[in-house]
Amino acid sequence: EGFGGDAYGFGLYPGQYGMALLSKYPIDVDDILTFQTFKWHHMPHPQVPIIPDESGSTDKGKPWYDVEEWAALRLSSKSHWDVPVKVAGKTVHILAMHPTPPNFDGSEDRNGKRNFDEIRLMADYLSPDKGAYIYDDNGEKVSLSENARFVLVGDFNAADIGDKHREGVIEQLTEHPLVNNDIIPTSAGGAGASGAEFSNRFTAYWGARADYVLPSRFGFDVNDAGVFWPAKTSDLYRLVKDREASSDHRLVWISLSLTEDN
């Protein structure tokens, strides 16, 4: 039908909206973990999409997915990764994901619920006591080790403020005790893109902080951070001026220094 809603994740062809990681540091390929095939119903207390009744209540509503669909459906709409990278003798876990946007659905809120649980999967993975249910694409139970250095990266499709903010979603990560969200990346271009007082933190031209680079509190000092979104007066604005130039999202960067393990 020209639409990708009949796939595990939206796409008009296999691999659309795929993920890639480029690193100037060596990647520990043998220890990469992926969670693409983790079944949504295997998450404890998942946010099951329910079609509301005529009154708007979901108490007696019908599940959006039938039994066969729900049993087969993956949680990850693209993939979830734990990629260990070796930096100066230390291991840094790149925790990457691209959850589905929380819209393009109906009153059952299937994409909103999936976005919440995709983010929850990564939040639970940070805490072995909460993530004991998680298995990788080899079917092995896995968790992040205590005092691991990590950086969460990706288009999380979850705003932290404004009219696109859904309370309690991105906070699963930004307010997680192991995650450092103290420095919020900003840009001059974002500041001029909207009248909102917080628009300097936007990472997408449609007005939201949707893309994140969140380091662990353990193991790093944060030197600086920003969003590559030049102001219209900059010579570099040509790189982001429209969709013909580049993405509707902006590059988010952070400068980190390794600290001692103790």
Task: Locate predicted features.
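Active-site His/acidic residue clusters
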Residues: 92-113
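Short, structured coil/loop segments at alpha-helix boundaries
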Residues: 70, 105-107, 163
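Metal-dependent phosphoester-hydrolase catalytic domains
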Residues: 24-45, 52-54, 75, 84-85, ...
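Structured beta-strand-rich core segments of catalytic domains in phosphoester-bond hydrolases
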Residues: 1-91, 99
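Generic beta-strand/beta-sheet core signal
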Residues: 18, 95-97, 153, 215
